[in-house]
Amino acid sequence: NNLYLLQPSNLKDEGFISKLKLLNANLQVVVAFRMLPKIVWKMPQYGTFNLHASLLPLYRGAAPIHWAIINGENKTGVTTFFIDEKIDTGKIIFQKEIPIYDDEIVGELHDRLMYLGADLVSKTVTHIQNGEVKTQKQIQDGKNIKMAPKLFTENCKINWGDNLDSIYNRIRGLNPSPGAWSKMKNNGVETTVKIYRVKKEKIKHSNSIGCIIPSKKNIKVAVEDGYIFIEEIKISGKKKLDAASLLNGFSFSSDATMY
């Protein structure tokens, strides 16, 4: 597309700064990028604004879409704000809210927010250009501000001792990437699995937590207050399969367990 690209490994590199200054930009827009040094975001006449995939000050951090679903939120949105010295704390320009559907996975929500965000960036640029922007300061701290830290292997593991809704939300909040995972013991063999599509059923039962109950077409796992029905799973060393396909060539022992 004949775009002029600067891709520095060090954002404070003097050569990069010089080339950026030569562009003489009067406004900079940032989407899904690392923290900028002050010399960069202060450079344009009208500053630098960022698009963030949450309703700030909620879910500051690297994974706002994931954590909104993991925490069971029923709404989220996008925010444009002017960048300042800290991460995701600058003055808010515009916000747009949308619902989170009960069975929505993070990949689906990401795509809806992507289009919403593009429209909000366009609106923000137009209002800055026309001198029509009125900003709002963010609340900087407080017990109600939830964060969205980077996702690591440790916080993607399913805790089968959690309640039904928490497990369900964690799995869909990590689907398709990076994926919620669990240890599984079957026929005396321990392995790792990633679980993707699931459904839930809230019901009292007497099964032990984590026990796997297969049938001809589905796989369910007992949790404290119901069952998680696994619709899509990837066993380590195998490809991702829907439950019915897995059950065609894979058998579970009577004491098979997720843990």
Task: Describe the function of each predicted region.
Residues 159, 188-194:
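Short coil-to-beta-strand transition motifs
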Residues 141-144, 188, 199:
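Glycine-rich beta-alpha junction loops
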Residues 198-228, 236-237:
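Low-complexity, glycine/alanine/valine/leucine- and proline-rich hydrophobic stretches
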Residues 182-183, 194-197:
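Short beta-strand segments
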Residues 1-176, 181, 226-229, 235, ...:
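One-carbon transfer enzymes
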Residues 183-190, 223-225:
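Short acidic, glycine-rich loop/turn motifs
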